[in-house]
Amino acid sequence: MAHIEKQAGELQEKLIAVNRVSKTVKGGRIFSFTALTVVGDGNGRVGFGYGKAREVPAAIQKAMEKARRNMINVALNHGTLQHPVKGVHTGSRVFMQPASEGTGIIAGGAMRAVLEVAGVHNVLAKAYGSTNPINVVRATIDGLENMNSPEMVAAKRGKSVEEILG
């Protein structure tokens, strides 16, 4: 698994995986490459992209462009999550829970890259089921998308934040 990290303006870019794939035709095989990348501002914005091309650099470039276009906002709580969350995509299930200051990112592979660029500094996370990087990234982003801040919950219920936090 290749890891490249670049700063593009204020965005952090991480390459999670590059894979050679082939298409079989009458004359033999046609090889191409796929790249999976994540992009984030380190402050709650994160996106992922999947690109495919005949050459590795072109696949990475396509993936980075898609990642920049598909960014979501995540409401973080002082560098950690608001509450424990689960994310699911096909056969991958992820569980993430907030951790105290100084814990660091305790997560594996593709999940770690997503959490780093999103700006999460303290989290405990575990991937269950399929560890296919694409599915793990999608499940992680699904979990982060489904996380609600106390302000969001209070607005939905028509109550004050103090009532929600009890």
Swiss-Prot record:
GO terms for molecular function: rRNA binding; structural constituent of ribosome. Keywords: Ribonucleoprotein, Ribosomal protein, RNA-binding, rRNA-binding. The keyword rRNA-binding applies. One of its GO terms (cellular component) is small ribosomal subunit. Gene3D superfamilies: 3.30.160.20, 3.30.230.10. InterPro entries: Ribosomal_Su5_D2-typ_SF, Ribosomal_uS5, Ribosomal_uS5_bac-type, Ribosomal_uS5_C, Ribosomal_uS5_N, Ribosomal_uS5_N_CS, Ribsml_uS5_D2-typ_fold_subgr. It comes from the Bacteria. It holds the Pfam family Ribosomal_S5_C. Residues 11-74 form the S5 DRBM domain. The keyword rRNA-binding applies. GO terms for biological process: translation. With S4 and S12 plays an important role in translational accuracy. Located at the back of the 30S subunit body where it stabilizes the conformation of the head with respect to the body. The N-terminal domain interacts with the head of the 30S subunit; the C-terminal domain interacts with the body and contacts protein S4. The interaction surface between S4 and S5 is involved in control of translational fidelity. Belongs to the universal ribosomal protein uS5 family. Part of the 30S ribosomal subunit. Contacts proteins S4 and S8. This is Small ribosomal subunit protein uS5. It comes from Enterobacter sp. (strain 638). The lineage of its organism: Bacteria, Pseudomonadati, Pseudomonadota, Gammaproteobacteria, Enterobacterales.
